[in-house]
């Protein structure tokens, strides 16, 4: 294996200037996300979600962004999963988007709250049939005996809903993340990257600061 310490890449594709920054970070995020989609970035809506246990132990996993409404980031998951249990006790959350092809990252901190059951129902109905069945039978984050256990449960549940509308289970739904800090990172040559931090103030306006790389 190649020496890991020798692996590096020079970032040269773009820059981020103060004059380009809108007052609202959601506007810049939407533009960057669209540019990632237009550039055919693999999984442009992938989010690294960070939560914390009651003991202060962090954990991360990757989910997909499924909406950006009223300034909130929306994703869906099993409420009984590890992240769901942690968010029930501590709503503080971090989200990270990494678009390697564009040499860009966005890091978000905020609080998460469940979306309404009606909103979760609406999205659940849009999911592929087999994904809906899978959501009903998977005890997410829990130990299982084998993959065959999942397959058997899937086949049994699919037969139960044959010819019927698959209902959303109560333990599955969405979270809306309200951001309070958003950092935009653009790779630059010589590791002199551009970093800008938006911080939400008590008056509802965003303060913008350039950070040292």
UniProtKB/Swiss-Prot annotation:
Binds 1 FMN per subunit. Its EC number is 1.4.3.5. Substrate binds at residues 8-11, 66, 123, 127, 131, 191-193. FMN binds at residues 61-66, 76-77, 82-83, 105, 140-141, 185, 195. One of its GO terms (biological process) is pyridoxine biosynthetic process. It catalyses: pyridoxamine 5'-phosphate + O2 + H2O = pyridoxal 5'-phosphate + H2O2 + NH4(+); pyridoxine 5'-phosphate + O2 = pyridoxal 5'-phosphate + H2O2. Pathway: Cofactor metabolism; pyridoxal 5'-phosphate salvage; pyridoxal 5'-phosphate from pyridoxamine 5'-phosphate: step 1/1; Cofactor metabolism; pyridoxal 5'-phosphate salvage; pyridoxal 5'-phosphate from pyridoxine 5'-phosphate: step 1/1. Its cofactor is FMN. GO terms for molecular function: FMN binding; pyridoxamine phosphate oxidase activity. It comes from the Bacteria. Keywords: Flavoprotein, FMN, Oxidoreductase, Pyridoxine biosynthesis. InterPro entries: Pyridox_Oxase (IPR000659), Pyridox_Oxase_CS (IPR019740), Pyridox_Oxase_N (IPR011576), Pyridoxamine_oxidase_dimer_C (IPR019576), Split_barrel_FMN-bd (IPR012349). Homodimer. NCBIfam families: pdxH, PRK05679.1. Belongs to the pyridoxamine 5'-phosphate oxidase family. Catalyzes the oxidation of either pyridoxine 5'-phosphate (PNP) or pyridoxamine 5'-phosphate (PMP) into pyridoxal 5'-phosphate (PLP). This is Pyridoxine/pyridoxamine 5'-phosphate oxidase. The gene is pdxH.
């Amino acid at each position: 294996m190649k020496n890991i310490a020798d692996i590096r890449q020079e970032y040269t594709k773009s820059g981020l200037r103060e004059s380009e920054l809108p007052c609202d970070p959601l506007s810049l995020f939407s533009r960057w996300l669209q540019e990632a989609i237009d550039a055919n970035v693999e999984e442009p809506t992938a989010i690294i979600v960070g939560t914390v246990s009651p003991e202060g132990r962090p954990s991360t996993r990757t989910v997909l962004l499924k909406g950006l409404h009223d300034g909130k980031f929306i994703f869906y998951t099993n409420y009984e999963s590890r992240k769901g249990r942690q968010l029930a006790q501590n709503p503080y959350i971090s989200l990270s988007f990494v678009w390697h092809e564009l040499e860009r990252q966005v890091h978000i901190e905020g609080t998460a709250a469940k979306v309404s059951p009606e909103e979760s129902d609406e999205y659940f109905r849009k999911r592929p049939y087999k994904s809906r069945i899978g959501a009903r039978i998977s005890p997410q984050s829990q130990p299982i005996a084998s993959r065959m256990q999942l397959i058997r449960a899937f086949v049994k549940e699919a037969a139960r809903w044959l010819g019927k509308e698959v209902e959303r289970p109560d333990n599955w739904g969405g979270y809306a993340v309200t951001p309070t800090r958003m950092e935009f990172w653009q790779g630059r040559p010589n590791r002199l990257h551009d970093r800008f931090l938006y911080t939400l103030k008590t008056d509802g306006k965003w303060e913008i600061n350039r950070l040292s790389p």
